[in-house]
Amino acid sequence: DPSGSPHIRILPQETFEDICRLPSDSGDCLRFFEMWYFDGTTCTKFVYGGYGGNDNRFPTEKACMKRCAKA
């Protein structure tokens, strides 16, 4: 974008919820980042390699629960 404005992508509600149904995916690299994913019931810690993977990946348990836990 020549204007230099950031791009904002709006996800449909079903896509938003589907992210939380994806399996944990450590990605394609061999680095070691402790991250959190939603396992269908709760948020669980896993090791992320730093590249690739899917969007069911959060920096904190709180961020994971906020996004995926049902009230």
From Swiss-Prot:
Site (May bind Kv1): 22
UniProt cross-references to InterPro entries, sorted A to Z: Kunitz_BPTI, Kunitz_BPTI_sf, Serpin_venom_toxin
Predominant place of localization: secreted
UniProt tissue specificity: Expressed by the venom gland.
Subcellular location as annotated: Secreted
One Gene Ontology cellular component: extracellular region
Domain BPTI/Kunitz inhibitor: 23-68
Site (Reactive bond for chymotrypsin) residue list: 30-31
Intrachain S-S bonds: 20-68, 43-64
One GO BP annotation of this record: envenomation resulting in negative regulation of voltage-gated potassium channel activity in another organism
Keywords: Disulfide bond, Protease inhibitor, Secreted, Serine protease inhibitor, Signal
SMART domains: KU (SM00131)
Any GO MF annotation of the entry: serine-type endopeptidase inhibitor activity
Coiled coil, from the record: none
Stretch forming the signal peptide: 1-22
Family of the protein in this entry: Belongs to the venom Kunitz-type family. 03 (sub-Kunitz) subfamily.
Chain's role: Serine protease inhibitor that inhibits trypsin at a molar ratio of 1:1.
Name listed for the protein in its UniProt record: Kunitz-type serine protease inhibitor HNTX-852
